[in-house]
Amino acid sequence: MFCVAPPESEAKMNITKGGLVLFSANSNSSCMELSKKIAERLGVEMGKVQVYQEPDRETRVQIQESVRGKDVFIIQTVSKDVNTTIMELLIMVYACKTSCAKSIIGVVPYFPYSKQCKMRKRGSIVSKLLASMMCKAGLTHLITMDLHQKEIQGFFNIPVDNLRASPFLLQYIQEEIPDYRNAVIVAKSPASAKRAQSFAERLRLGIAVIHGEAQDAESDLVDGRHSPPMVRSAAAIHPSLEIPMLIPKEKPPITVVGDVGGRIAIIVDDIIDDVDSFLAAAETLKERGAYKIFVMATHGLLSSDAPLLIEESAIDEVVVTNTIPHEIQKLQCPKIKTVDISMTLSEAIRRIHNGESMSYLFRNIGLDD
């Protein structure tokens, strides 16, 4: 695992006052690795708590130490059973609230249901619902990382610190890809062009954008909530009324805007889940002359058979952070590499607990980052 090693004198972060309790809300032990890293960096012990499933699949939380008047930080990483993960967090937050904790800060590196943050036909904005549930349960502050859409912050009526993993990914490129100067940053769809531009400008590299069949289905969102009346029926009711309709979309043939011939292609995105679009992008880049292909993202969901598909694809390496546990996927696919971001989360916890400014963690971050 690639990680930024702090100087020896800074191996343990300085907690200037007492009253900090650090809990992991996961009942799955494989999801606790990040919590242990954060506790080690802060130089504190993990709080004593039991989180388990009853025989009837109900979630039960038993806090086994006093939290009265303390700053409670609850770390929750998303497992495959995302709904159980959410219930574990909500029940633990509510348990701390009823136990008179001074403040309850959720540390949720990957915010679940973040891909459902827009209205799709007769669907719902689920991330807004989840934000309301967290606030209602008693959460007073949220620390997360690289929200799928920054507008999700507005769904909360509590402070939200949306940290960035890009400094760690940029450092990985500079230190682990020897000839990265001959690389080009690639957006696999126009929707991810801003993120690619941010990486390219910081690394002083060129940019390429894939447009066409390989672009995300999410870019084709339909925002209609009700079925519109047929134009003819509307005109029949009001003969003078002719409502103009949008022309149906048609994807153009796949195109790469930018030169990738004889270069390393680095595809950047925030989430890797369904890898079909990444595989199609990699094939296209190979056809256009790219000789090595990297994929970099903050959150490695890697659902279903994604690791096996990556292993058999033209992609040379997939780099993700440890916001989500993926040790099993790494066993299935040696191409998957991990970047440790526990340092940023630990520093955020330390600063919030000590009442220090968070601006240090947001240096040089622009509106498009």
Curated annotation (Swiss-Prot):
Coiled-coil portions: none
Keyword Disulfide bond annotated: no
Family assignment from sequence similarity: Belongs to the ribose-phosphate pyrophosphokinase family.
Gene Ontology terms describing biological process: 5-phosphoribose 1-diphosphate biosynthetic process; purine nucleotide biosynthetic process
Protein name: Phosphoribosyl pyrophosphate synthase-associated protein 2
Chain's role: Seems to play a negative regulatory role in 5-phosphoribose 1-diphosphate synthesis.
Residues of the signal peptide: none
Keyword Phosphoprotein tagged: yes
Record text on subunit structure and interactions: Binds to PRPS1 and PRPS2.
The organism's place on the tree of life at top rank: Eukaryota
SUPFAM superfamilies: PRTase-like
Modified residues (N-acetylmethionine): 1
The entry's keywords: Acetylation, Nucleotide biosynthesis, Phosphoprotein
Phosphoserine carried by residues: 219, 227, 233
GO cellular component: cytoplasm
GO molecular-function terms, A-Z: enzyme regulator activity; magnesium ion binding
One Pfam family per UniProt: Pribosyl_synth
